[in-house]
Amino acid sequence: MTIRERMKKGMLYTDMGEGLEEERIRCKELVYDYNNTRPRESERRSELLKEILGTAGKNIFIEPPFHMAYGTNVHVGDNFYANFNLVIVDDIEVYIGDNVMIAPNVTISPTGHPVDPETRITGKQFSIPVTIEDNVWIGASSVILPGIK
């Protein structure tokens, strides 16, 4: 079974191999470009978000800085706003509906690690998709964990 198949099934996996490192580097470079745009470069930011995200609806704005692992696993609906310091650890899909607002310092992590220390030290992790439905507001410093709907 491939790493990607293990990821999609919620099984334990390591995130090395099968081109995964290169995909994360690609995302980091695009996010770096986004985070270093000037405040008036809103058109450039919109272009970059379309490159970073798997799906990008209309009227999306993310205050820099923000961070993502892959970007392509994040699917955002229309009228989305995220304040400063959004972190999305998108080893697997994150679905964000329409009219969603996210306050500062929010982490969305569909990826977790085993609680058993002997298993955890092997470097394995698991991922379960996260879905944030329409018209949701997420308060400051919230942490969204694997499998949340």
Functional labels for PLM-detected ranges:
Residues 66-76, 81-149:
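Flexible, glycine/small-residue-enriched loop-and-beta-strand segment within the central core
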